[in-house]
């Protein structure tokens, strides 16, 4: 921030653009790793990655054909039906923008009660359960709009499993690995290639 004389938002934009400018060096480092896969976290809010050309450039340059995007679901927002639908809409937008395999990941599940986590996972796996939860609420403009969005998401095929993860408990990474195996190798162990 000091070097470029910008605030936090400007620094995040510059960080995203610097990643694109230094892509060859980053690609070299990634390719030199003795790892079957690399998790690549992008700076700042998703808008910096999704809505700027540098995000698409990063995926294309690093290899869209071997990329998977993990969309992170906030646990607090996901606890309500309308909150989850809002996140599903954002996820669908990212999926349309990049058109690569996609994982829905519920983060910080240690912040949720078991029942809350299970409800979110059930809603993600079955849109009809989510619609039922909305319809059980007092009808409002927000709930009606959510049902309309849900109809669009259903036609888009947005009903997908959500993978719960917790860094506090170290849970969920094996599920992400297994899902990546399913996507690219039909369940076989990942291999460099």
Predicted segments with their positions:
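A short helix-to-beta-strand connector/capping loop
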Residues: 35, 156-161
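Conserved catalytic-core segment of NTP-binding enzymes
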Residues: 47-155
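Conserved GTPase G-domain signal focused on the G5
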Residues: 168-184
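Interdomain boundary/hinge elements
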Residues: 132-136, 188-193
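Nucleotide-state-sensitive switch-loop elements of NTP-binding domains
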Residues: 1-57, 63-68
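Expand to "…catalyze enediolate/carbanion chemistry for C-C bond making/breaking, isomerization
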Residues: 17-20, 27-28, 84, 157, ...
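Phosphate-binding beta-loop-alpha motif at adenosine-nucleotide cofactor sites
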Residues: 40, 160-170
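Core catalytic machinery and nucleic-acid-binding channels of phosphodiester-processing enzymes
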Residues: 33, 37-39, 68, 74-76, ...
């Amino acid at each position: 921030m000091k070097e470029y004389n910008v605030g936090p938002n400007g620094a995040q934009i510059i960080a995203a653009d610097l990643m694109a400018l230094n892509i060859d060096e980053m690609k070299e480092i990634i390719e030199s790793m003795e790892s079957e896969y690399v998790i690549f976290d992008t700076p700042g809010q998703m808008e910096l990655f999704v809505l700027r050309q540098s995000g698409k450039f990063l995926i294309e340059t690093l290899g869209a054909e071997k990329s998977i995007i993990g969309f992170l679901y906030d646990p607090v927002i996901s606890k309500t039906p309308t909150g989850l639908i809002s996140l599903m809409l954002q996820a669908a937008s990212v999926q349309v923008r990049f058109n690569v395999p996609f994982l829905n990941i519920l983060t910080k599940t240690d912040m949720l009660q078991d029942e809350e986590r299970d409800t979110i996972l059930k809603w993600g796996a079955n849109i009809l359960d989510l619609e039922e939860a909305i319809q059980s609420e007092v009808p409002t403009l927000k709930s009606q709009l959510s049902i309309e969005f849900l109809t669009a998401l259903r036609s888009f095929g947005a009903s997908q499993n959500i993978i719960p993860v917790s860094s506090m408990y170290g849970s969920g990474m094996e599920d992400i690995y297994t899902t990546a195996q399913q996507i690219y190798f039909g369940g076989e162990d990942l291999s460099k290639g």
